[in-house]
Amino acid sequence: MANSTVAEPEKMEQSGTCEEDEEEENMEGDEDECDDDEEENMEPAETVTIGSTYKCRRSDNTLHAAEIIKTRKTKENAEEFYVHYVGLNRRQNEWVDKSRVLQAKQIKTEELNNTEDETNGVSDQSEGKAARSNKRKIEDGDGDQKKRKVDDEEDDFTEDLTCPLCRSLFKEPVILECGHNFCKHCIDKSWESASAFSCPECKEVLTERKYTTNRVLANLVKKAAVGVKDKDVKPKEKCDEHDERLKLFCKDDGTLACVICRDSLKHSNHNFLPIQDAVGVYRDQLIALVSPLETTMKENQKLKCDQSQKISLHRENIVDCKKHIECEFEKLHQFLREKEAKMVEDLNAEREGLLKDMEANLVKMTDNCEFIEEAISTTQSRLNESDPIAFLTDIKSFIEKCCEEHRKGVPAESVLVNKELSQGRFKGPLQYIIWKELKSVVQPGLAPLTLDPNTAHPNLVLSEGLTSVKYTDTKQQLPDNPKRFSQCILVLGAEGFDSGKHYWEVEVGNKTAWDVGMASESSNRKGKIKLNPKNGYWAIWLRNGNAFKALESPSKTLNLTSKPSKIGVYLDYEGGQVSFYNADDMSPIYTFNGSFTEKLYPYLSPFLQDSGKNAEPLKLVHTKL
């Protein structure tokens, strides 16, 4: 009988034995006859309940117990059921119409387990007794067979909880409209390049990209994971499509293949490697990835270390600023305590803003280091994999992911954040900053500076008191001594400083261009000079009436809220600080930080006259407070 032909291999596969026993064959034959009798007495079920188990006619025209999973309506408004066949070695689900659900009576689990005993009961009594006797002998004498059966059941259970795409236990399982389950990540990836959304299992085209989280399945996976987490899940060694051994690796698709896959249209004109050769090729690629990753790791670790050092330095700088603030305000006695508290409050506010970005960047760098360390660990784990099948599974996507992370290198935002504290505000001449409010209290006087005529460019004219300078189109005949500027239109102060703290002011008025700053004693005076700290110049300038710059290397554009008429200059020699202020309201303009090893001189430049628009002189301020 046709049914007997199908049932016998199925029973042999489930029992795990290939023994040809005459009594067993007779028993199986009798069971098939009972199945035929049972089918003759069946009719389509009148009502079908989701979650219940019924006899269902399979696509190969055989009967098998099936659990009803879900239902749907076809375009013709006919009802269909998505069923799961119980007890098969391979998971098999499908949609069936109502006519194929043949038994309305719910089949209990005990009935399923005893199906063979019940069907054998319709055979003659002597054969039934012989079969039961034979069964008891098998149960009593074949413990290994029982163990294999339990293992098979566990494998079936694990198979039901395995994503058909990644072949691993479900992660965030979702269920499609057709009833098939996949990992959320797997189905998203499968649909990325698809023109239409369809189920990878049954190929049913879906109306939209839609799925639902399967929480029940997720809970089952969690429970199953407890039992299998210590077991090694070996990759398949046979092709799912052709049931042939996987002997090749497709370089174009990055997948394992059998010899039939190689000759199929799907892999037409593709390049293949034997598995062992592919292991060698991709192992070399992984090895080549380790070194760049380690280099990137070292770079991130260095940045992390540098950032930590910068944060420590800024913390120390904040402490120094606070001490300076407290010391200066102590000189102003008790009635200035309120102003002191306000300054400390502003410092703390700037501290929070300054350290926030740097500490956030430090966290990013720490995360980068941890991420790269994890990538190295994952790569090393893959390199240590001895099983070629496991090694090559998803190897191409794995390497592409590693390459992508390496190409990123140190992300653009993962650079050293080095924000400067407003030293000009908190560590400057605080008595002058509050001078406008406290003229009756502050009486230190400005540094009495004069200009050195032996350093002045020949087109510069100094006042009789050597306190102002202006440009003239007539070049004066002056001795070309080593101190004199030959090309740059500059003049130095007569008094230099090699210690202490000093403050002075320069009146710039409405001039459209000027330079104000400091110059080292050994700085170059001849020819064209690049004015920056590397060459011994710390200065700011104005050009074209509104373009302010700090002469760093490279120069920095300064955005001032108002155009100053006087520039204040503060030098803290031991502190390595030169700060510039809008002397009208003592708002800080810019601060240079460094270390000084020789005497420093004030320097001025009135610049060119600009057709009379910039003819005003620069003046050193000697007014008492």
UniProtKB/Swiss-Prot annotation:
Alphabetized UniProt keyword annotations: Chromosome, Coiled coil, Developmental protein, Metal-binding, Nucleus, RNA-binding, Zinc, Zinc-finger
Protein localization: Nucleus; Chromosome
Entry keyword annotation includes Transmembrane: no
Coiled coil: 337-386
Chain residues that bind Zn(2+): C239, H242, C261, H267
GO cellular component: chromosome; nucleus
Gene3D superfamilies recorded: 2.30.30.140, 2.60.120.920, Classic Zinc Finger, Zinc/RING finger domain, C3HC4 (zinc finger)
Pfam families: PRY (PF13765), SPRY (PF00622), Tudor-knot (PF11717), zf-B_box (PF00643), zf-C3HC4_4 (PF15227)
Entry keyword annotation includes RNA-binding: yes
One function term, GO molecular function aspect: RNA binding
Residue segments, region Disordered: 1-53, 112-151
The organism of origin for this protein: Pleurodeles waltl (Iberian ribbed newt)
Residue ranges covered by zinc fingers (RING-type): 163-203
UniProt-listed InterPro entries: B30.2/SPRY, B30.2/SPRY_sf, Bbox_C, Butyrophylin_SPRY, Chromo-like_dom_sf, Chromo/chromo_shadow_dom, ConA-like_dom_sf, PRY
Chain ranges of the B30.2/SPRY domain: 429-625
Record-annotated Tudor-knot domain positions: 48-101
Functional summary from the UniProt entry: May be a nuclear regulatory protein that is stored in the germinal vesicle for use during early embryogenesis and may play a role in the synthesis or processing of pre-mRNA during oogenesis. Binds 3 Zn(2+) ions.
Protein known as: Zinc-binding protein A33
Compositionally biased spans, kind Acidic residues: 18-43
SMART domains per UniProt: BBC, BBOX, CHROMO, PRY, RING, SPRY
UniProt feature, compositional bias: Basic and acidic residues: 126-151
Positions annotated as zinc finger (B box-type): 234-275
